[in-house]
Amino acid sequence: MYSEPKQDRSKATEEAFLSALDTLLVQTSFKNLSIEDIAREAGISKGAFLRRFGSKRQALYVLYDRYCEKTVVVMDRIVSELPLKEQATESLFDMSKSLERLIKEDYSCNRAMREDFQENLEVHPSTRRIFLYCVEIMRRTQKRFFGVTNETGAYSAAQILITNTFEYVFNAMPGLPRDYEQRHKLMAEILLVALQAGDIGTSK
């Protein structure tokens, strides 16, 4: 069972292993990476790695949690700036470009987590937490600009934003505009429609 290191030496050991893992993930897939490779890159024994993490998968999860912590900081900033936006598309544009930047900055870690999901079909708790926070931001966006919220729109917009951005970064959506501004403006317009999904098809 993994637990956060408390002593300076243990913290330094963990940092060395995570840095090695992050470096190696740039060069190879998570599946083809061995504990021996990580230990060799870190210059520390395989036994020390197993004592610290227990498994290669757990080490990836620790690295991924750090990415999620950075993501939450950005999401907090988006929430704090929401009252300053004059139009919903301004905030949605910000969400789109911010998420793309975050995924690209930690591309290797996100790619490895994608591998892990495809192999194990398990959603990591931090992934679920980020998704639900994104849903909450969509609710706040609805409340700010429409005066009401609806769950269909909030969940739909969050899903579209996260899934489409990930797939674009991983080169699975070549049909989207290559131009940065155009791409994120398009995504903002799509999200605006999605936020109102609960109202589509209804009439009074």
What feature does the model see in each segment?
Residues 10, 14, 64, 68, ...:
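Amphipathic, non-transmembrane alpha-helical scaffold segments
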